[in-house]
Design a protein with these regions (language model features):
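…; additionally, a secondary subgroup of soluble metalloenzymes is captured
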Residues: 1-302
Length: 302
């Protein structure tokens, strides 16, 4: 599977942004219970499948002339000690408004029972980063006033962190300040709807944070790097597919694999294509010309 972008143009025709990235919807279903899946992957906690859980993430909002842009977490270099310090400052406010204790603190992700915020419509940082946050802020769904309550808590934390020594030290080192808190992924494990193809998978490959929790939920072994000696009945979420295509091509030609199913998301829509060894060398219409090998560039551009 290769990551795709949301159908943003289609979304702009509506009042609300697209719900989730296509790969998020493909793996987890339309309810998008990202937070409990991340929690399952990052901790040894026994996660209640019927408990709505939220993911809170310390972030940097970059100010332009007329709007704010959410930076990706990979761009802010938040350390474990900084994460602990920032949570300690914000914890009383978070737990008071959520009416729950924080369940688990990772370096980048904090998890808590969603409580009164369970009905919020949210978007992951993967989807919202690099964009004007006005359109991607949490919205009310079936309960009015919840988004306003979140903005109040968010503003309180922003003021606390603005004067926090963590940000003073980061500024001295030339790092972006941690100036806001993002909420996303609200849902229950019971809401997961995995694709049928995972029913026959014996191994999951990839380093996306969602995979560790999803593999644990499905009781399927998972590892970050692909073991090319173990490719049959496997699922891989690949960031740089061009870097492994030659290995996969060799596995098909060597009959180590019968077929490869490529899943991608052109214009936000799920596309499945199956390739066998017969597809690897397409004969030109000019029969006297040598057949050309199927490259990843040809696959992804078709």
């Amino acid at each position: 599977m290769v990551s795709g972008e949301d159908a943003i143009d289609a979304g702009l025709e509506r009042d609300t942004p697209p719900s989730g990235l296509p790969q998020e919807r493909f793996l987890l279903g339309d309810q998008l219970p990202i937070a409990p899946v991340l929690l399952l992957g990052q901790s040894d906690l026994a996660v209640n499948p019927n408990e709505a859980i939220a993911c809170l993430q310390p972030v940097h909002l970059h100010a332009t002339r007329d709007h704010l842009i959410l930076m990706a977490q990979s761009q802010i270099d938040l350390t474990a000690s900084e994460s602990v310090s920032l949570l300690q400052v914000a914890l009383p406010f978070i737990e008071e408004d959520f009416r729950n204790k924080v369940l688990f603190q990772g370096q980048r992700d904090w998890f808590i029972s969603a409580g009164p915020f369970a009905s919020l419509a949210t978007h992951s940082i993967d989807q919202a980063h690099g964009r004007n946050i006005d359109w991607w802020m949490p919205r009310d769904t079936n309960v009015t006033g919840v988004a306003k309550l979140w903005r109040k808590l968010q503003n309180e934390i922003q003021m606390l962190w603005h004067i926090d020594p963590v940000n003073q030290e980061r500024e001295q080192r030339g790092y972006p300040s941690i100036n806001s808190l993002w909420i996303s992924g609200i849902g229950k494990l019971a809401d997961i709807q995995t694709p049928p193809l995972l029913e026959n998978v014996d191994q999951i490959y990839g380093d996306h944070p969602l995979l560790a929790g999803l593999a644990k939920y499905l009781a399927i072994p998972q590892q970050r790097e692909i073991d090319f000696s173990n490719l049959q009945n496997t699922f891989a979420w690949i960031d740089r597919p061009e870097s492994i295509w030659d290995n996969l091509r060799a596995a098909l030609l060597g009959n180590e694999l019968d077929e490869i199913e490529v899943i991608d998301f052109p214009k936000g829509q799920t596309r499945h294509r199956i390739f066998t060894s017969k597809d690897l060398n397409k004969q030109s219409w000019a029969f006297w010309k040598k057949s050309e090998p199927l490259t990843w560039q040809k696959i992804i551009s078709s």
